[in-house]
Amino acid sequence: MSDVLKSSQERSRKRRLLLAQTLGLSSVDDLKKALGNAEDINSSRQLNSGGQREEEDGGASSSKKTPNEIIYRDSSTFLKGTQSSNPHNDYCQHFVDTGQRPQNFIRDVGLADRFEEYPKLRELIKLKDKLIQDTASAPMYLKADLKSLDVKTLGAKFDVILIEPPLEEYARAAPSVATVGGAPRVFWNWDDILNLDVGEIAAHRSFVFLWCGSSEGLDMGRNCLKKWGFRRCEDICWIRTNINKPGHSKQLEPKAVFQRTKEHCLMGIKGTVRRSTDGDFIHANVDIDLIISEEEEFGSFEKPIEIFHIIEHFCLGRRRLHLFGRDSSIRPGWLTVGPELTNSNFNSELYQTYFAEAPATGCTSRIELLRPKSPPPNSKVLRGRGRGFPRGRGRPR
């Protein structure tokens, strides 16, 4: 029994020594003062010996501060990488103190430095970007009201459709910014979006990416995918940082308690596409389903450009359509359609000629070697009841 007690006391001594080193104390004896245990013990003893006397003197002593009392003015003491009185991180408290969102401290989120420690992935991204640039068609754009436009007149079936509707949710978050180019901005409800004839312009195997906000759009977006003939297969989440302009209230909806700092882009699939066998059409697992980038100015509805990189890296189809695009989103390899465009250059016949010979970007041998692939299927092995013998009434001796 004495050995067990000695072992327990030794472990306790080591824990106190380690805690003292963590808190930067010179000796273990200072732990009581640093953690406040000494004051608690003294007050407990005083309470037991003379409760009435302490109660009488309580009013006079309550206004006096303890000489060694630590007063925290902010949460910098509790952040990662500092000498801390509490080894835990508290980025939520730091947001209350400074307005810096917790996601501001996630490292290596940019496209340039994301794969610095992964040379093969870095080479893969570089090669794919070069191939996409070389095979991209000339950018085309069409200024049109999508409520009255018959999308069948585009005369093409698309491999990828990116939809970026001006949701009423955005108007609730920023009611003061309801104009574009001096004209009132038209916001769409989900019934209008549901009536878009997206299924008619989607190829037999294709993908749709629908920005749906962060509230009721998650459910309504799934209804849209279902009506258009797509199956939801992924949810890309955009986490907005505020490193450049920290603050507490940027886009707060009426009667809202919390500020929304993320937005969702639902991904749908049409037809049968398997990543293990359809390497000529998709390259899976090249990017992640998370975008972390700085939010735009107040009232801006711009989405991160990284969504284009994710789509182009994933789907090798070259027929790409962007609905509700703007002048800032015109991009080689894409047909951009939207009411906020200032000009048009779309020609249906010319657009068709771009894909007559090569509807996909193709793939080089080096990209095929570097890209992540699905594991090979398990080989079928006959399994018996014991020692690997096949099933049967008997076995040869």
UniProtKB/Swiss-Prot annotation:
The record's listing under InterPro entries reads:
METTL14-like, MT-A70-like, SAM-dependent_MTases_sf
Please name the GO terms of the biological process aspect recorded for this protein, alphabetically: cell differentiation; female sex determination; mRNA modification; mRNA processing; regulation of alternative mRNA splicing, via spliceosome; RNA methylation; RNA splicing; sex differentiation
Read off the PANTHER family from this record.
N6-ADENOSINE-METHYLTRANSFERASE NON-CATALYTIC SUBUNIT (PTHR13107:SF0)
Disruption of the gene: reported phenotype: Flies have a reduced lifespan and exhibit multiple behavioral defects: flight and locomotion are severely affected and they spend more time grooming. They also display a mild held-out wing appearance resulting from failure to fold their wings together over the dorsal surface of the thorax and abdomen.
**Organism this protein belongs to:** Drosophila melanogaster (Fruit fly)
State the encoding gene. Mettl14
Give the Gene Ontology MF terms in alphabetical order: mRNA binding
Protein name stated in the entry: N(6)-adenosine-methyltransferase non-catalytic subunit METTL14
What is said about its interaction partners and assembly? Component of the WMM complex, a N6-methyltransferase complex composed of a catalytic subcomplex, named MAC, and of an associated subcomplex, named MACOM. The MAC subcomplex is composed of Ime4/Mettl3 and Mettl14. The MACOM subcomplex is composed of fl(2)d, Flacc/Xio, Hakai, vir, and, in some cases of nito.
Q: Where is the composition biased (Polar residues)?
A: 40-51
- Does Metal-binding count among this protein's keywords? no
Q: What does this protein do?
A: Non-catalytic component of the WMM complex, a complex that mediates N6-methyladenosine (m6A) methylation of mRNAs, a modification that plays a role in the efficiency of mRNA splicing and is required for sex determination. In the heterodimer formed with Ime4/Mettl3, Mettl14 constitutes the RNA-binding scaffold that recognizes the substrate rather than the catalytic core.
Which family does this protein fall into?
Belongs to the MT-A70-like family.
Compositional bias of type Basic residues: which residue ranges? 382-397
Q: What is its main location?
A: nucleus
Pfam families membership: MT-A70
